[in-house]
Amino acid sequence: FVAIQQGYVIAVDGVVVHCGESIPPAYGEHPITDYGDHLIIPGFVDTHAHAPQYCNRGLGMDKELLPWLETYTFPEEAKFSDQEYARLVYGAFVHDLWRNGTTRSILFGTIHKDSTLVLMELLQKAGLSAYVGKVNMDRNSPEFLIEDTQQSLADTKEWLEASAQFGPLVKPIITPRFVPSCTSELMSGLGNLAEAYNVPVQSHLSENHGEIE
């Protein structure tokens, strides 16, 4: 990276068009805001985070992934069927993103479409940019988190259409949790939705021996 000790950042319509030690003549008449000795840096980018795991960070460091999910994460994610709980936790999560300068992120939500919309709403209100996923799971999971395949696809379609309200900063991303928790039928249906709505896909792949075996 390049550090400019005393310099200028020029933005036009929200887009940075120049960084340097002097102001180009074309922008010489524009208003200037002096930030003194403050640091001006690009926002940080987190390309993989689980927003509903905010409250169980650092727990179960002695466990492999699958036992960790069963012991800590799945019971925590089940709580997000309650939108009030989701708003409380996601509010704290989004505030921490903002406070630490993470301005762009790619996030997992939970299987609950309405709580995932709450997360997207809070990100938009905070002025943060993100891809947000409603998680899909229809096998090899606790009963309280297993979705019916067709209902999972219907909920995802409904969520994709509702996501249009959030504009250019906060966008949906198709999110099958990982192969062990998704049937071929679900994966195929999600692929069709990704193509129909022109949205990207995120998941996990081969994170540990237990998952692969």
Report residues per predicted region:
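Divalent metal-coordination and catalytic microenvironments
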Residues: 9, 14, 37, 48, ...
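Histidine-rich, glycine-flanked metal-binding segment
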Residues: 1-41
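Short amphipathic alpha-helical segments at helix-loop
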Residues: 37, 74-78, 141-144, 175
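General alpha-helical segment detector with a strong preference for membrane-spanning helices
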Residues: 50-54, 105, 208
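Alpha-helical scaffold segments that flank or form the walls of functional sites
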Residues: 57-128, 152-166
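Metal-coordinating catalytic core of metallo-dependent amide/deamination hydrolases
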Residues: 114-213
